[in-house]
């Protein structure tokens, strides 16, 4: 029988259907992960931070792309999210290269520097959050922020520009998914997501 970890060998990112879910704990959907991970530039042997890991979906795919010599820190302030992320990482991550941390992102102090940081949720004050982590970014490191609300989008762009990030980019992603209705399919729209990214000098 095919194992859970081998099922995603056919995919660039792990299918949403393979993740355990709990109501109230957010998950970055696979289409958004694909774009976000590309913008992050996750590579073999790199060091990456996932802020607001939720279900752990981004961390799982970071783990695969970073390989056995990579290192991922997945951070969340919600104990239920950390427990759920642990279940998903144990089932789906092919490498033991992820450290789960229960902490508020504004209070957490990393011991190392990062090649890229993903900010996916639980971020009420983006300008201060981005400023806090700038000293922990390597030269040329990337930050990617996912936003649903327009205010969060504006805060994300402002945060990167105030910290002198280069090549600040905004992509709006609108996904519709086909649902069987009788003999045909109806396209059901999901919420639009803004993917904001920038590079450290």
From Swiss-Prot:
One of its GO terms (molecular function) is cobalt-precorrin-6B C5-methyltransferase activity. InterPro entries: CbiT, Cbl_synth_MTase_CbiT, Cobalamin_biosynth_MTase, Methyltranfer_dom, SAM-dependent_MTases_sf. It comes from the Archaea. It catalyses: Co-precorrin-6B + S-adenosyl-L-methionine = Co-precorrin-7 + S-adenosyl-L-homocysteine + CO2. It is an enzyme of class 2 (transferase). The keyword Methyltransferase applies. Gene3D superfamilies: Vaccinia Virus protein VP39. One of its GO terms (biological process) is methylation. CDD domains: AdoMet_MTases. Keywords: Cobalamin biosynthesis, Methyltransferase, S-adenosyl-L-methionine, Transferase. Pathway: Cofactor biosynthesis; adenosylcobalamin biosynthesis; cob(II)yrinate a,c-diamide from sirohydrochlorin (anaerobic route): step 8/10. S-adenosyl-L-methionine binds at residues 28, 52-56, 76, 105. Its EC number is 2.1.1.196. HAMAP family: CbiT. Belongs to the methyltransferase superfamily. Archaeal-type CbiT family. This is Probable cobalt-precorrin-6B C(15)-methyltransferase (decarboxylating). It comes from Thermoplasma volcanium (strain ATCC 51530 / DSM 4299 / JCM 9571 / NBRC 15438 / GSS1).
């Amino acid at each position: 029988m095919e194992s859970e970890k081998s099922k995603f060998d056919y995919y660039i990112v792990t299918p949403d259907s393979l993740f355990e879910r709990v109501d109230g704990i957010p998950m970055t959907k696979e289409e958004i992960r694909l774009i976000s991970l590309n913008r992050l530039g996750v590579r073999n042997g790199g060091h990456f931070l996932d802020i607001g890991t939720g279900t752990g979906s981004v961390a799982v795919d970071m783990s695969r792309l970073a390989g056995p010599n990579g290192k991922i820190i997945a951070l969340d302030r919600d104990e239920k999210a950390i427990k759920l992320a642990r279940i998903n990482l144990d089932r789906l991550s092919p490498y033991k290269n992820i450290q789960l941390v229960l902490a508020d992102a504004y209070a957490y102090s990393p011991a190392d520097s990062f090649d890229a940081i993903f900010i996916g949720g639980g971020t009420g004050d983006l300008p201060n959050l981005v400023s806090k982590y700038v000293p922990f970014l390597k030269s040329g490191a990337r930050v990617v922020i996912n936003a649903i609300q327009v205010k969060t989008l504006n805060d994300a762009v402002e945060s990167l520009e105030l910290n002198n990030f280069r090549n600040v980019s905004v992509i709006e992603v609108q996904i519709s998914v086909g649902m069987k209705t009788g003999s045909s399919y109806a396209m059901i729209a999901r919420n639009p997501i803004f993917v904001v990214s920038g590079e450290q000098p």
